Amino acid sequence: MSSPDKVSVCGAGFDLEGGKKAGSRTASPGAPGAHSHGLDLGVPGSGDGKSESGFTDPEGFSFESESELIEQGRVVLWGREGRPGTPVDDQGDVVDYSFYLADEPAAIVPPPSVQGHPFPEGAAAEGSAENWADAEVGPSGRDVLGHSPGKWQQASAGRLHLCGPGPVRAWKNPERGSKSRWSLRVDPQQPSAKGPTRLPTHDSDSADESSDLPLMKVGICRNEGSQAKPGSPKKRADTSRQASFHCKESYLPVPGRFLTSAPRGLTPVAERPAVGELEDSPQKKMQSRAWGKVEVRPSCSGAAAAGALPQGLSRRKMAGGKKSLGGASQLALGRGFPACGERLSAAPPEPATFPPFSGVRPQGMSKKPQKPKHSSPGKKPAGRKTRESQAAAREDNDPNRDEVPRAQLPTHRPGLPRLSVRRGEFSSSDPNIRAPQLPGTSEPSAYSPGGLVPRRHAPSGNQQPPVHPPRPERQQQPPGAQGCPRCIWLQREIEDLTQQLAAMQFLTDKFQDL
C-alpha cells in the first residue's frame, strides 16, 4: 500500500518507562523514522544494536529478553517467527497489512501497572475491525513499525483486537505453543493525560465499516499454536474479518462473567433474610400441622415449633410465635399440659369438639365397628340370623324336638311345609337341586320338605346328611295328611307342569333330529 495507508495503535495510558505516557503510533511502509513515541520497548536510542540486558541480531536490531521485560513491567510485542536473528523475506511494498496479520499470532505481556491505567475516553476507532498493529525495531535502535510489508508476514508483532467496552481484565489462556496467550482489557471510561487518540486511516471501506461501531477497546493477544501461512490477500482478508469478529464474541461476554460473579459474592448477604424466613417457616408448618392434623402431633407440636425458632429472633417474635403456638398446642393437647413457656390461664376447649388422637376410637364413631358385616366367611347376614332364630324358637316350642337330631329338621311339623310352599323351593330326586326347578318325575312332591332342610341349614355345614334320612318320615306322613288343601293343589299343578315339560323336551328332540 502507499503511504496514506497507516496503522495506529491506541497506546495511550500505558506507563512503559517511569511514568512516560504513550501516545499514538503511526507507521507507513516508507517511513523508517516515523513517530516512535508509542509503545516503548525499553531499547536505548543508539544505533549500535545492543541493549543492556538483551541480545543483538546480525542486522543490528536490539531486543531485550522477554523474561526481563515481563519483570520490569514493559510491553513486549513479539511475533513468534520474527524473533531476533530470524531472516525474513521481503515480499513487496503494495500489500495490505491486515492481510498478513489476519492469521498472525501476537502477544502482549501486560505489566501489573497497565491493568489499572485508563483508556482515553474520547478515543474512537475510525479504522475497520481488521486493523492490525506491528512493532519492529529499526536500524537506529528506535522501535518503529516495519519498513516493508514483506516483513509483516513472519515478523509481525501484534494483532489489534477491537472489542466492546468492559472492565479492566487480564487473563491467561494456555495455548499449544511454548508460551501462553495474554489478553489485556483497558477501561475507556477514565481520560488519560494525552487526550483522545485516533486510528487514522484513509481507506473508505474500512471507514464505512467502522462508522457504525461505538467506542471500542484494543486488545492485543498472541496465539502460539498457529503459524502464519502465505496466501492470497482475499483469503487473508476473510480470515481477518472472521478473527476480529471471533475476538469480539470472545471478549464481549467477559463483563457478563464479572457481573454474574459479583452477585455470587453478595448471595450470603442477600440470602440472610431468606434464611430467616426459612427459619420461620418451620414454625408456620408446625402450626398448620397442629391445626390440621391434631392426631399426628398430640402433645409436642407446640414445644417442637417453639424449639425450631432461631436464636437470633427478637423476644417480640418469640412472644408472637408462642401465642400462636399456644393456641395450636391447646388444640392438639385438649386436657394435656400446654406448650413450653405457656400459662394455664387459657381454658382448653372441649375435647369432644375436636378430632380425636390417632389410635384412640372416638365416642361419636361407635358405628364404625359395624362396617365389616360380611368380612368373615363364618358369619351370616342379619336376615338369615332372624330366620334361624325364628326356626329355633319353633323348635323349642315343638314337643317332638328330641326325636330327631337337631341338625335335621323334622318334616312332620306343620310350619315347615308352608314355608317351603311359599318360597317355592321344590327339589327333584337329586338332592343338589334346590332351586325352584321343575322335576322330571312326580315324586318331588314327597321330597319338597326334604329340600328345605339343607337349604336352611346350609351355613352350619350339615348340607348333605339331612337329605337322606327323611325318606322313612315321608312314608309316615304323606303330603296332604296335615289338612293343607293348598299343598295338594300345588302338587297337582306340579304334575301338570312336569307333563308339559316332558312334551316340550320331546318336541325339542324332534327339531334337533330334523
UniProtKB/Swiss-Prot annotation:
Compositional bias annotation for Basic residues: 368-384
Biased composition (Basic and acidic residues): 385-405
Pfam families: DUF4641
Top-rank taxon: Eukaryota
Region feature Disordered, mapped onto this chain: 1-68, 109-244, 272-484
Annotated protein name in UniProt: Uncharacterized protein CXorf49
Protein source organism: Homo sapiens (Human)
